[in-house]
Amino acid sequence: MRVAQVVRNTSETQISVKIDLDGTGRQKLATGVPFLDHMLDQIARHGLVDLDIEANGDTHIDDHHTVEDVGITLGQAVAKAVGDRKGIRRYGHSYVPLDEALSRVVIDFSGRPGLEFHVPFTRARIGTFDVDLSIEFFRGFVNHAGVTLHIDNLRGVNAHHQLETVFKAFGRALRMAVELDERAAGQIPSTKGSL
């Protein structure tokens, strides 16, 4: 079973993430940031991973620490659940549309953290959610999952649609990358022999 639980406590946030990479998309989310919960739901449902995430943070100041630290903790949990990366497909990609919006996400479980985030948001906030926090979420994720991640919103007018297509495509790309390839069972997907 490829499951993991990570608890991260700082003076700013207390976060618990449980993940099952071979799940069905079941989720239980309570981050204190409703729009973040909505986006995490997209990862679970479209990635077919089971996610239980609880967070208590200093949201009385703003949502920055909570969103970033959920990304960090989710990245740690994914890295732990994937383990030595033997037998995974390693690469994943997805294009997802939502009405006028279209996003592409490509992920590589390379062991080298890197983020290319290109989303020309049409407004600064979605409700009360600061769209800049999405960058902090994904930066935290890549740095702690050890992945290279390219995120491109190719078109969109509605900022909610833009970001929702990003999270849906991320879930689908994640699913593809961590999927076990029976033809490569027990093998590291790299000519170097390690990731």
From Swiss-Prot:
Major enzyme class: lyase
Gene Ontology MF annotations: imidazoleglycerol-phosphate dehydratase activity
Pfam families found in the cross-reference section: IGPD
Source taxon at top rank: Bacteria
GO BP term, pick one: L-histidine biosynthetic process
Coiled coil start-end: none
PROSITE patterns: IGP_DEHYDRATASE_1, IGP_DEHYDRATASE_2
Signal peptide start-end: none
UniProt-annotated location(s): Cytoplasm
Record EC number: 4.2.1.19
Biochemical pathway: Amino-acid biosynthesis; L-histidine biosynthesis; L-histidine from 5-phospho-alpha-D-ribose 1-diphosphate: step 6/9
Gene3D superfamilies from the UniProt entry: Imidazole glycerol phosphate dehydratase, domain 1
Protein name: Imidazoleglycerol-phosphate dehydratase
Source organism of the structure: Burkholderia pseudomallei (strain 1710b)
Gene: hisB
